[in-house]
Amino acid sequence: MELWFTEHQDENLRFSIKVKETLVVEKTPYQHLAILDSYQFGRVLVLDGILQTTEKDEFVYHEMIVHVPLFTHKNPKDVLIIGGGDGGSVREVLKHSSVERVVLAEIDEAVIRNSKKYLPTISSALDDPRVEIMIGDGIKYVNEHKNEFDVVIVDSTDPIGPAVGLFTSDFYRAVYECLREDGIIVAQTESPFIYGKLINKISKMFKEIYPITKAYIATVPTYPGSLWTFTMGSKKYDPEEVDINSIPRIQTKYYTPEIHKAAFVLPKFVKDIFDEV
């Protein structure tokens, strides 16, 4: 008998993968968690029925949400990651030699615990001494810390359940206060094929708060529509003005200095979504 996992990406769209084995299923205080071993994408993390990351393509998302803002900033030392309990973003942040401290604010300890056990290639850096793990509400943490971080990475789930508050103007304004005078925020902002209205709304909120707001893209095969957007707000540095020849070569599988520059060249329909008044 064949076992398949199907994600309902939209009322008219589903995505299925063939499963070898169910490794863990857990009802946490916040969500339903499952880690499955699939034939095509290796082990996959699923939260509330939505695929979050896979061993085969996770590097695209994690490299792009991290290296674009960190190489835009001139000297990132303190980095806050909100969400991201699988540890992939932490792993990528620690490839930057300037980083002295990473705070991971994850509301659900079960994500961290199960990722450490079942997703070791993704969670491999969570025990690094530079990492501080804060189990709790990332919004509350941001509101309690002012002028403390160089980069804030919003590595959230989709805008449902515990992540809803991470897609609001109040939150983005609180992050502004949490950042230092040359700080940068980057947030994953969903698929332009599915969440066009949400992307436009977020773009407007960022533009009201951050002097420099830019959008960039990457291709993540297991995410809805495969094309994924990220929105960056910066107090000082323009990511498109980075001298790509000065970006040091680090060990990556997707990100390169050339990709850094190319990611800001948006398809017209995506640019229209971000620019619509």
From Swiss-Prot:
Positions contributing to spermidine binding: 62, 86, 155-158
The EC number(s) this enzyme carries: 2.5.1.16
GO MF annotations, alphabetized: spermidine synthase activity
Keywords associated with the record: Cytoplasm, Polyamine biosynthesis, Spermidine biosynthesis, Transferase
Pathway where it operates: Amine and polyamine biosynthesis; spermidine biosynthesis; spermidine from putrescine: step 1/1
InterPro entries membership: PABS, PABS_CS, SAM-dependent_MTases_sf, Spermi_synthase, Spermidine_synt_N, Spermidine_synt_N_sf
Record text on subunit structure and interactions: Homodimer or homotetramer.
Ligand binding (S-methyl-5'-thioadenosine): 31, 106, 137-138, 162
Catalyses which reaction(s): S-adenosyl 3-(methylsulfanyl)propylamine + putrescine = S-methyl-5'-thioadenosine + spermidine + H(+)
Protein name: Polyamine aminopropyltransferase 1
Phylogenetic placement of the source organism: Bacteria, Bacillati, Bacillota, Clostridia, Thermoanaerobacterales
EC class name: transferase
PANTHER family in UniProt: SPERMIDINE SYNTHASE (PTHR11558:SF11), SPERMIDINE/SPERMINE SYNTHASE (PTHR11558)
Reported function: Catalyzes the irreversible transfer of a propylamine group from the amino donor S-adenosylmethioninamine (decarboxy-AdoMet) to putrescine (1,4-diaminobutane) to yield spermidine.
Gene: speE1
Presence of the UniProt keyword Oxidoreductase in the record: no
GO cellular component: cytosol
GO BP annotations, alphabetical order: spermidine biosynthetic process
NCBIfam families linked to this entry: MFS_SpdSyn, PRK00811.1, speE
Major localisation: cytoplasm
Subcellular location: Cytoplasm
Positions of the PABS domain: 2-235
Protein's UniProt keywords contain Cytoplasm: yes
Protein family (similarity comment): Belongs to the spermidine/spermine synthase family.
Active site annotation, chain numbering: 155
